[in-house]
Amino acid sequence: MISRTLLKRTVPASRLLRSFTTSNVRLSAHEEDLVNVNNLPRPKPTENYVPLINPTEKYKVQIEELHKFGTYIMSCLPKYIQQFSVWKDELTIYVAPSAIRPVMSYLKNHTSCQFKAVMDITAADYPSRTNRFDVVYNLLSDRHNSRIRVKTYANETSPVPSVTPLFNGANWYERETYDLFGVFFVGHPDLRRIMTDYGFEGHPLRKDFPTTGYTEVRYDEEKKRVIYEPLELTQAWRNFTVGSSVWEPVGEGKDFTPESFKLPTPQPEPEQEEKK
């Protein structure tokens, strides 16, 4: 132990009173022996070396495993799955609307899948197609720490079976997709709007929906309440034909998708003739 007389000679009294541990006292007693880090010699700078990673080999292991898994799923469900694709570390399978429930039930309950959580359900609008909507399901497997995407198709008149009986979390996702795109889900317990107001006209995320909407919401001083009025605009671009928009670029544009990843559009199932 350090004697009190030595501490009184080497350490000021004010510092000694504020020191609650012996380590602080020892450091204060030998401040001259401490090395000043700022005065140490610095190593000479060298050239920065960053290893080059080929983008095609970055996901090489994941792509091979996902291709095996996609092939395995197609071999188990050849009647329902039309095709599958792998992009980087993402696996997507394409099915017909009538196959949604069998495929989702398989992905949820099969031992090799265990995709028990639906993370998102959304859609994309392609007005030039016969089946203009791509309905997308994103699933998560906690057990295998993996994700999968399921895609199907629909239009304004053809509905899609609801997966709410399989996934309780799909309830609001399907309502949101119906509200914003107009995709109808058969078997949904409460299919009504969830994002827009009561009596809203149209579906905002469709490509043919005007950017200004159809009605104007404002507060009326005379009636002392919020009212809805039809818009009176003179813009020529307010009403445009299906498949065109004022925000489209000039020309067809360029498609940067690699040839190996371009997939044909799934064809709809042939209508079955009713037996007389």
UniProtKB/Swiss-Prot annotation:
EC numbers, comma separated: 7.1.1.2
Region Disordered, annotated ranges: 248-276
Entry's Gene Ontology cellular component terms: mitochondrial inner membrane
Keywords (A to Z) from UniProt: Electron transport, Membrane, Mitochondrion, Mitochondrion inner membrane, NAD, Oxidoreductase, Respiratory chain, Transit peptide, Translocase, Transport, Ubiquinone
Enzyme class: translocase
Family from the record: Belongs to the complex I 30 kDa subunit family.
Record note on quaternary structure: Complex I is composed of about 30 different subunits. This is a component of the iron-sulfur protein fraction.
Entry function: Core subunit of the mitochondrial membrane respiratory chain NADH dehydrogenase (Complex I) that is believed to belong to the minimal assembly required for catalysis. Complex I functions in the transfer of electrons from NADH to the respiratory chain. The immediate electron acceptor for the enzyme is believed to be ubiquinone. Essential for N-alkane assimilation.
PANTHER family: NADH DEHYDROGENASE [UBIQUINONE] IRON-SULFUR PROTEIN 3, MITOCHONDRIAL, NADH DEHYDROGENASE UBIQUINONE IRON-SULFUR PROTEIN 3
Entry protein name: Probable NADH-ubiquinone oxidoreductase 30.4 kDa subunit, mitochondrial
Organism this protein belongs to: Candida maltosa
